[in-house]
Amino acid sequence: MGIKHLFQVIQENAPDAIKAGDIKNHFGRKVAIDASMSIYSFLIAVRSEGQQLMSESGETTSHLMGMFYRTLRMVDNGIKPLYVFDGAPPKLKSGELAKRTARKAEATEAHEEAKETGTAEDVEKFSRRTVRVTREHNAECKKLLKLMGIPYIDAPTEAEAQCAVLARAGKVYAAASEDMDTLCFEAPILLRHLTFSEQRKEPIQEIHLNRTLEGLGMDRKQFIDLCILLGCDYLEPIPKVGPNTALKLIREHGSLEKVVEAIENDPKKKYVIPEDWPYQDARELFLHPDVREADHPECDFKWEAPDVEALVEFLVKDKGFNEDRVRNGAARLQKNLKTAQQSRLEGFFKPVARTDEEKASLKRKHDEKLQEQKKRKKEEAKAKKEAKAKPRGAA
């Protein structure tokens, strides 16, 4: 799920943190990819007539089709992908996972009913809601990656957190995931839409954490508190607290402790904190996740030549893929992984940190922009009020 409405908050309040561009812009870069999120998206998106792709023996192959061709697309564009798989989820996440399981069970029931009485659209809608990444899906994708010569590692817990460690250490350029909580784990750069199909024509979103914090006028701890208020995988959100209110509360009070205190002491009781809401534990999971350091032996990885005949055996003979396409893909892998070895010019230079004066200037511009937005909203509200009060037929 990630963080509810976080992209919207960044887009509206720290627009300079987001850069949209073509996949070709990332030529020569190594990227750590959240594998589980990618596989989930493949199971949902790679379909035929609303149903997941199947082999002749009735096995699902959408995850393998997506993994093979989307990885090929990245390598064709000079990107060197590293996939990171989830480990065991943190205990605090079990409540959210239980809710997801219950929702999927309801969707499965609704899917069966829709097949009997509903439209084709109903069937597809509920079918997508039943999707779950299994151990078998993960195991088959790992086997495929190994045969393709693409490295992968297993995270102790959250894949996004492990991707962030590798990005901070400079072993990869960025972490790639659709989950915005990757920023909470201190990934310097988050790439979104990297594993989308070319047909969707979605630009790659590049989100910079330092510019996000500067634009919001927050430190990392306050940013995490904001994300918890918005709604994360570990806790249910506070009812009636939307993105604008969450941002206002953190800016006004500075921390979740003070936000909770203000809510509990509010005589109007406008908001109610859920009974079991261990926000400090959630914050700790973001600040100190269970990860392996970048120099750990299990974080070593390298790209190798694909095993063409084993790929054909697995994808063509076992899973029913087209042999010509698989062999063509393997040839592209061999050629383009060598090409991706070329270094980008940016690798020879270190970015220059902003001075205190530059940071102060940015903050001042941001505050002025906020004041201008508030002023404009007041004027718009006043104009609407006057328009409503104006009698009909008046000139």
From Swiss-Prot:
Skewed-composition ranges (Basic and acidic residues): 353-389
Record-linked InterPro entries: 5-3_exonuclease_C_sf, Flap_endonuc, HhH2, PIN-like_dom_sf, XPG-I_dom, XPG/Rad2, XPG_CS, XPG_DNA_repair_N
Location (main, coarse): nucleus
Annotated residues for binding of Mg(2+) 2: 179, 181, 233
GO biological process: base-excision repair; DNA replication, removal of RNA primer
Cofactors, names only: Mg(2+)
SUPFAM superfamilies: 5' to 3' exonuclease, C-terminal subdomain (SSF47807), PIN domain-like (SSF88723)
Name recorded for this polypeptide: Flap endonuclease 1
Natural source organism: Neosartorya fischeri (strain ATCC 1020 / DSM 3700 / CBS 544.65 / FGSC A1164 / JCM 1740 / NRRL 181 / WB 181)
Organism taxonomic ancestry: Eukaryota, Fungi, Dikarya, Ascomycota, Pezizomycotina
